[in-house]
Curated annotation (Swiss-Prot):
Native species: Cronobacter sakazakii (strain ATCC BAA-894) (Enterobacter sakazakii)
Positions annotated to bind phosphoenolpyruvate: 22-23
Protein name (record): UDP-N-acetylglucosamine 1-carboxyvinyltransferase
Keywords on record: Cell cycle, Cell division, Cell shape, Cell wall biogenesis/degradation, Cytoplasm, Peptidoglycan synthesis, Pyruvate, Transferase
Record family assignment: Belongs to the EPSP synthase family. MurA subfamily.
Recorded GO MF terms: UDP-N-acetylglucosamine 1-carboxyvinyltransferase activity
Coiled-coil segments: none
UniProt binding sites for UDP-N-acetyl-alpha-D-glucosamine: 91, 120-124, 160-163, 305, 327
Gene label: murA
CDD domains per the UniProt record, alphabetical: UdpNAET
Main location: cytoplasm
Domain of life according to the entry: Bacteria
Record field: catalytic activity: phosphoenolpyruvate + UDP-N-acetyl-alpha-D-glucosamine = UDP-N-acetyl-3-O-(1-carboxyvinyl)-alpha-D-glucosamine + phosphate
Location within or outside the cell: Cytoplasm
């Protein structure tokens, strides 16, 4: 397995170009199964999960090509089962189910794998599809969905806010007969992006970005060209990199309007922030950040995917900050690793109390999930001495070329190829 060796401490300053959002590209790629004509998707990041998705789509009979953009032609799809071999590495595969049953009347997806953070049941996907008229069976580790004729529009009230299930229901409902209303829908920018993509193909979706999405079913979806929105979590990660190192960074090709809660907390931590239509700059003027209290919650509140980065910020800040995680259990696995680097923190159920220290020291640490591992790499950039981060395949699942981008900001980082 590959590792990163990071030599610190360094101040991170410079420019970084933000990639397309993985969490929008994935649902969009799966939603392309609904299209009867070719689709061109631009700004798709080069990531392991994206490669897996492209493999999965081609196993279903989709023509998939990548040259700059990703080109998808799902007109010849003739296999309706997403096999365990591919699904086990990536839980997003469940998103194949809605489009398959909506367009072809049948679909099977193996129960998914992915990051080891907490319980992420597929129940909400299943109940949503059942409410649209699909019959669902769980057999031999597969979720099997079928419907006679078309799905039927329904009024669906989500038990809890779920990005994944909102995508499944919204995608499937585009080809249902009649109108579907999703109440208590997720409001994330990636949901809005997926809806806008579907509308480009001829869907009739309104209300995306609010907690009530309305989908008027259509008979078919055609082709189109769509550009995936920039990755707000990658943006936030590089802003934190500058904030914890007293540096100055300019993020280009990003969308400040998707990061309100994060920018507010960075300003509270003492960062000087300016924004334009597609850029954000942050300047710490060489100062240490001030500790901030953070509570994760569904969008537009503070995102759980930025929690680990702000835990690190608090651990090197002036003062004490409290971080409360309300979305996933088991999402403080980076904290014991940071404690090995000299951080002072106590975990109490879903809260971590961070006492800022002036400096961290390099150590051997292990990545546990995607965002936690990015924080360990950033910690290595500012720690004294050498840090080795093991199991970085987690990072490769969600950050495109993170070592190249950090190097451009002045980090001393290299990838050590595993056996």
């Amino acid at each position: 397995m590959d590792k990163f060796r990071v030599q610190g401490p360094g101040r991170l300053s410079g420019e970084v170009t933000i990639s397309g959002a993985k969490n929008a590209a994935l649902p969009i790629l799966f939603a392309a199964l609904l299209a009867e004509e070719p689709v061109e998707i631009q700004n798709v990041p080069k990531l392991k999960d994206i490669d897996t998705t492209m493999k999965l789509l081609s196993q279903l009979g989709t023509k998939v090509e990548r040259n700059g953009s990703v080109w998808i032609d799902a007109s010849q799809v003739n296999i309706f089962c997403a096999p365990y071999e591919l699904v086990k590495t990536m839980r997003a595969s469940i998103w194949a189910l809605g489009p398959l049953v909506a367009r072809f009347g049948q679909g099977q997806v193996s129960l998914p794998g992915g990051c080891a953070i907490g319980a992420r049941p597929v129940d909400l996907h299943i109940t949503g599809l059942e409410q649209l008229g699909a019959e669902i069976k769980l057999e031999e580790g597969y979720v099997k969905a079928s419907v006679q004729g078309r799905l039927k529009g329904a009024h669906i009230v989500m038990d809890k806010v779920s990005v994944g299930a909102t995508v499944t229901i919204m995608s499937a409902a585009t080809l249902a007969e009649g109108t579907t209303v999703i109440e208590n829908a997720a409001r994330e920018p990636e949901i809005v992006d997926t809806a806008n993509f579907l509308n480009t193909l001829g869907a009739k979706i309104t209300g995306q970005g609010t907690d009530k999405i309305t989908i008027e079913g259509v008979e078919r979806l055609g082709g189109g060209v769509y550009r995936v929105l920039p990755d707000r979590i990658e943006t936030g990660t590089f802003l934190v990199a500058a904030a914890i190192s007293g540096g100055k960074v300019m993020c280009r090709n990003t969308r400040p309007d998707t990061l309100d809660a994060v920018l507010a907390k960075l300003r509270e931590a003492g960062a000087d922030i300016e924004t334009g239509e597609d850029w954000i700059s942050l300047d710490m003027h060489g100062k240490r950040p001030k500790a901030v209290n953070v509570r994760t919650a569904p969008h537009p509140a503070f995102p759980t995917d930025m929690q680990a980065q702000f835990t690190l910020l608090n651990l090197v800040a002036e003062g004490t900050g409290v971080i409360t995680e309300t979305i996933f259990e088991n999402r403080f696995m980076h904290v014991p690793e940071l404690i090995r680097m000299g951080a002072h923190a106590e975990i109490e159920s879903n809260t971590v109390i961070c006492h800022g220290v002036e400096k961290l020291s390099g150590a051997q640490v292990m990545a546990t999930d995607l965002r936690a591992s990015a924080s360990l790499v950033l910690a290595g950039c500012i720690a004294e001495g050498t840090t080795v981060v093991d199991r970085i395949y987690h990072i490769d699942r969600g950050y495109e070329g993170i070592e190249d981008k950090l190097r451009a900001l002045g980090a001393n980082i290299e990838r050590i190829k595993g056996e």
